[in-house]
Amino acid sequence: MTQSGQAESETPSTLIHCVRDRQQAKRELERLANRSTGNSQKQAMATVEDILDTVRSQGDQALITLTERFDGFRPEPLTVAPEELEDAWRKTPQKLQSALELAYRRIQDFHQHQRPNDLMVQGIHGEQLGRRWRPVQKAGIYIPGGRAAYPSTVLMNAVPAQVAGVEQLVMTSPAGRDGQINRTVLAAAHLAGIREVLRLGGAQAIAALAFGTETVPKVDVISGPGNLYVTLAKKAVYGQVGIDSLAGPSEVLVIADQSARVEQVAADLLAQSEHDPLAAAVLLTTEASLAEQLPSHLEAQLKGHPREQICRASLSNWGLVVICESLERCAQLSDHFAPEHLELLVEHPHAIADCIKNAGAIFIGPWTPEAVGDYLAGPNHTLPTCGTARFSGALSVETFLRHTSLIEFNRSALEATANAVRELASSEGLHSHAESVRIRFE
């Protein structure tokens, strides 16, 4: 093991390390899944709790003071004027406008199919039993800033809320030191019909949405990814408001066999690693020759790369190649990791896809790079990370909906079930439960 705790590489490259041993592979995948935890999270949580308390007690003034401290400008006003949104769209190049419009249409088209239907059934004694869906009234969406601008995330969060029927949608995103939010992000907000935009980032933005201030409305649900402080803030306010998920750093896992082209594999791993130094890029392959060729292709594609240092940090710390004896073993290891994004660069991808139990999104075949899912395929790109695909899924229309049970008994239905209700109530020692049934027949 190296001082950093990584397994020694079986390839000559120090850029990404390779293992063959089954148990070592599982240990490495577990290390990658836990890459966002540790002492830094405990320290950050103390800061987050202080920020939440300050915003709750001081409102707008806290937002201004905290933004000046952390982001280097005074957000006065806190809100972006509608004219700024319109201006951002007008100044967006035509080709980019067209690309955003295409993405918006495709995301809308897919999410329209996610609307659940109300349910009403009749029981055996004539009772009516149902489930009714209704949207939350207010939702807040957080759009990260920092290393890159994410107009696609605006669309991916706004569309399901709109399809759900949310009445009021509030967007918040960190601004630069000049006080301006990225123009393309504002253009995407304009396209999506968002009218309330805040120049706020970090835990203070989440606090504002969760508690409300003089300017910021208190919302019912908060969605959207962010850095560690944003994620911890969402975790802390959950229960006061609903949240979509606790997003960690992004990841991709590629399963490849002899049919895969090594240059495509390299490009897809780099497409993930360029996000963040904490992004994880994993290759599971049955082909030792593919694993051996990969480092040189990564190096070649990194030459002149505008985000080379981020890619190198990601791959050297959180990159992994595992040589497996079979595709079945690849699928088992993938399920153990439960990746956010799973690419299947294999000869018979549907056979593998059918075996997969845990993945945020599966990209099937050589013509489906993760990038199409990130931008405009249609399914949501806000996905579970760091192993949470074992028990959760993508952001969806249902994130912004609540379902209410509907129950209507008539006299005969209550008569037919009254003895059982009273018996169950008595077994739990709840006298008035039983009495509430009996008294109806006096």
From Swiss-Prot:
Report the domain of life of the source organism: Bacteria
Keyword vocabulary terms for this entry = Amino-acid biosynthesis, Histidine biosynthesis, Metal-binding, NAD, Oxidoreductase, Zinc
EC number per UniProt: 1.1.1.23
- What are the annotated GO cellular component locations? cytosol
Q: Does the keyword NAD apply?
A: yes
Q: In which pathway does it act?
A: Amino-acid biosynthesis; L-histidine biosynthesis; L-histidine from 5-phospho-alpha-D-ribose 1-diphosphate: step 9/9
Cofactors required: Zn(2+)
Q: Name one Pfam family in it.
A: Histidinol_dh
Q: Does the keyword Chloroplast apply?
A: no
Give me the comment on cofactor binding.
Binds 1 zinc ion per subunit.
- The name this protein carries in UniProt is Histidinol dehydrogenase
Q: What is the native source organism of this protein?
A: Prochlorococcus marinus (strain MIT 9313)
